């Protein structure tokens, strides 16, 4: 039934597991994907959307490296919006509303095209370990499957408990069993675990809603694909809608707080700070008269709509009564109730920066098992874990993205060195080099790395080369040619004209000289926007590049593996404990560890220089 030994076994078929399995198999590893239900591969367990603030950037990065989340998103997209357009370009973040069923179907089809990727529907309950090295897995039916490496991407399934009011039952997702025993086995080996909580909103029958009482939220045109390989042709986008809760909603929920597992003590673990339940919002912000609710279609051929902003674990009848008080929902029919789920995770400080565990060789963790929340964060970790599992078993150097290279680098660096005690989600504010890490330049930052790894297709290389050629040609044209600006009554170089804050690229392309050049050379709008951005933000970009060089200097000060921090008497006790625990490879890594102060770093540098 199974080959003698797989190169990589991926446990879990969500966003993280799917990316991990494809990355490993695309790099040549004979891979087995084990999941509890093959029909639920690539499920959107919560809202049917991809991208958003900082998350859209990560999808672009996954795509630039040769991952698939961007391609799948484009194939299932039913609405596109570019968020934060009123702010600077570092903040622009693409977001797509997706067809939930098509998204999952496309993942399954994509995975099944790989000849060296096999599938098995079962539950992994134990690992086979020899001399602190993983050599396989054991399933719930007692089947042993050997492998050179294992990637755990268990999502919310480890000892998952679902809460709806007073009712609670074991489950990793509604109507799906949780995974029991694996956490306990890992703890027995020496890992430590924690508990986290997340939740989802009710789904309603769209035919029962009065959309005339809501605010239409249309998609943006033109639609911009997430993948650099996609050519989108979506003629009609689905509408989303906005409505609001009110004091009647809040009063009804407040009276039933004692029936919420969040308030009555049944759920004791921490949920996502930036995605609280509706009852938490009403409680925390008692002075607010309303809260925004987004009504999002679940797909093209379904009546279901997702009620974004109304995540809840209240009893079903309370959820329903509260929903009826919202404008447009007066005659709503509930298709599925919202629920909360608590689950086990393993603090990510137990990992190396290639996502391999420090304790067990060739064992990798990715996704919510590491304390993150969100499809995009999970997919990014899966891609990196899949790459590094392949590299490790082939005795190659690990693939590690730096903080100045990608949001994915920021994500993993934060997890490894700072850890998390609440579900971690990515924001642009977490990246200190966010002007460099824009959504428009992910291919320029990362595709060459994907080429070196062997993940990037010829089509992708060809597209990037063509883009760079056109960009260089256009920039040179702007640099050497002058334009007669009738408004300013000046004849100046196009670059200088564009550097003025009151002049946009759209003003420039109206000039006949430039219009003819663009038409003749078939210059894409995105290239023009990138050149404009570089010219207008040149000072900021150069400053960030200088900051990167300063940080790089800290990274070059290496710390020996056997370095004894007890020798350094002047650093704080907390810093010494953290450094002994994390064992950073460089001063740069040490500086990012929570509890290690700039003063500790200065003392450490002086000590290393003297040595």
UniProtKB/Swiss-Prot annotation:
Residues given in the record as FAD binding sites: 12-17
Binding site for NAD(+): 271-285
Keyword annotations of the record: Cytoplasm, FAD, Flavoprotein, NAD, tRNA processing
Main subcellular localisation: cytoplasm
InterPro entries: FAD/NAD-bd_sf, GIDA_C_N, MnmG, MnmG-rel, MnmG-rel_CS, MnmG_C, MnmG_C_subdom, MnmG_C_subdom_sf
Molecular function in Gene Ontology: flavin adenine dinucleotide binding
One GO CC term on file: cytosol
Purpose: NAD-binding protein involved in the addition of a carboxymethylaminomethyl (cmnm) group at the wobble position (U34) of certain tRNAs, forming tRNA-cmnm(5)s(2)U34.
NCBIfam families according to UniProt: mnmG_gidA
Subunit structure: Homodimer. Heterotetramer of two MnmE and two MnmG subunits.
Listed name of the protein: tRNA uridine 5-carboxymethylaminomethyl modification enzyme MnmG
Species assigned in the record: Karelsulcia muelleri (strain GWSS) (Sulcia muelleri)
